[in-house]
């Protein structure tokens, strides 16, 4: 019997002509329907560039949504758990948003241009959900993923590289600040943001400018040993920094087939982003307030020190009674810390917070210890 199998071809980013030439491994990854390199040369060299020099990564596949309208500020305030009432124009904020049950839909960054114009960047496609949530608000949405080319320029020499590129006075840009530049005759938005835990910036421009931007930045960083880096190196840096990743360290509520897979902000270390005292209502506020008051969070996300040097991703964690108490969600050997480190989701009371941003020391056998 013949079967008609249909596949959707992966799209190429505006930087593909350059990233494909730079890749010596031909290893690629499907990121939101785009093909991007997982590794250009070796992950170790790319990681080293991110930690000691300048690294460049194609961020174009990241979901990008423009939010416009007279109620844009009010809608964003309704959408996210964080109080953004004091957020200034031309700044960026790290945010999470939940469903009405207080379970995390995704995390991301919100760029504020004015009270009537924002850009939301995140890992999971939420265009339809934004529309469904906006009933009663005077707002419109544009999926800008395909119409905005983006690069991450990360590492301790990233500022010097971008100044060579033409971003004058970039050293004055504060963390989570953003500024519009005109470089080589085209507009470039530069934000001091990133996913490596190091000094870094993200650049946003029209796709027509992508190849010139790539070539110019690579030339600007030539003396600073600039190097492209792929998804594997990014994974290493974000684990070291303790940054969470949707559908890796937790399942997005909309993607979870079973409620038990969903997580609240308090269960993934994001309680500091939940501002229950903000005056306006936000999606999930009632459920999160109840969870906070009753203390009935079932799990927590913690960092681990792993004995030995064997990969620990997906490993089950047991207590002294050989009972399953959690699972390792992400792990790596850290060249910087010279340790085998990991992130893990544990059942409470293991790893319960005792102070804001602090967790208790929980020592486990088999063969993992949990200080965070």
Question: What are these model-derived regions, one by one?
Answer:
Residues 56, 86-88, 97-103, 108-114, ...:
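Short, charge-rich binding segments
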Residues 1-24, 30-31, 38, 112-364, ...:
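Conserved, structured C-terminal
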Residues 61, 71-76, 93, 104-109, ...:
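Generic hydrophobic, aliphatic-rich segments that mediate packing or membrane embedding
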Residues 70-106, 158-188:
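Internal amphipathic helical hairpin motif
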